[in-house]
């Protein structure tokens, strides 16, 4: 490495022995030999790295040369097919950009739709005023339904009462009561048979009793 011959090395040892003495000379020799080993290892690593870099560079250059040679040796048919594929790809890219630009102005934006479910379904949520009006109309609907049910009950009740009254009147009218005028009684003498007939009619009326009128609230 340093191009040191045997004679030169022997001269260095003699000078070290004279200067350092026999006690320090072995220590100095070991120290110098360690430095030499370290320098040699560093030099070897640097040489290896440089060699690897050079090999990589040579490989890259050779690959580039092969690629260029392969492209030059391609047949005209392959070149034409490659050119057609490139043109088709460029045409598709241009058409996609044109479609995106034409659809952008016609897009309708709805800033009022903020709910995720409404955006997913495409339905605009109801306005607060509509919801308030619907809640305000709910009690009115319930009151109207209750009033209609009450009216139907009230209308059905008088029919039953009228029917009961009519039945009572029919019962009273159906009783065979003979009307006797006051003048006739005064003018004509009353026979025993007539008295018995009147007594029997009175007994029938008393046994029949007054007609009962049924009302929805209860019996009267």
Curated annotation (Swiss-Prot):
Molecular function as annotated in GO:
protein transmembrane transporter activity
What is this protein for, i.e. what is its function? Part of the twin-arginine translocation (Tat) system that transports large folded proteins containing a characteristic twin-arginine motif in their signal peptide across membranes. Together with TatC, TatB is part of a receptor directly interacting with Tat signal peptides. TatB may form an oligomeric binding site that transiently accommodates folded Tat precursor proteins before their translocation.
Subcellular localization, as worded in the UniProt entry? Cell inner membrane
HAMAP family, alphabetized? TatB (MF_00237)
Per the annotation, which location comes first and is thus the protein's main one?
membrane
Q: Which Gene3D superfamilies match?
A: 1.20.5.3310
Write down the membrane topology.
Single-pass membrane protein
Q: Where is the signal peptide?
A: none
**Location of region: Disordered:** 190-220
One GO cellular component term of this record is: TAT protein transport complex
Residues that span the membrane, as ranges: 1-21
Q: What is this protein called?
A: Sec-independent protein translocase protein TatB
């Amino acid at each position: 490495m340093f191009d040191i011959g045997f004679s030169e090395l022997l001269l260095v040892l003699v000078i070290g022995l004279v200067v350092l003495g026999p006690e320090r000379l072995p220590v100095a020799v070991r120290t110098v030999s360690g430095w030499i080993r370290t320098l040699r290892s560093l030099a070897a690593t640097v040489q290896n790295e440089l060699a690897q870099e050079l090999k990589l560079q040579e490989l890259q250059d050779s690959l580039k040369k092969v690629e260029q040679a392969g492209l030059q040796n391609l047949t005209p048919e392959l070149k034409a097919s490659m050119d057609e594929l490139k043109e088709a790809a460029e045409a598709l890219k241009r058409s996609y950009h044109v479609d995106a630009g034409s659809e952008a102005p016609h897009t309708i934006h709805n800033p009022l739709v903020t709910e995720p479910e409404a955006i997913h379904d495409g339905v605009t949520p109801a306005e607060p005023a509509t919801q308030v009006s619907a809640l305000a109309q709910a009690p009115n609907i319930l009151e109207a339904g209750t009033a209609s049910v009450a009216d139907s009950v009230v209308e059905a009740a008088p029919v039953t009462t009228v029917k009961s009254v009519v039945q009572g009147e029919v019962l009273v009218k159906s009783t065979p009561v003979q009307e006797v005028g006051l003048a006739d009684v005064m003018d004509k003498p009353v026979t025993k048979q007539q008295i018995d007939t009147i007594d029997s009619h009175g007994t029938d009326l008393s046994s029949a009793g007054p007609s009962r009128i049924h009302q929805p609230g209860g019996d009267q």
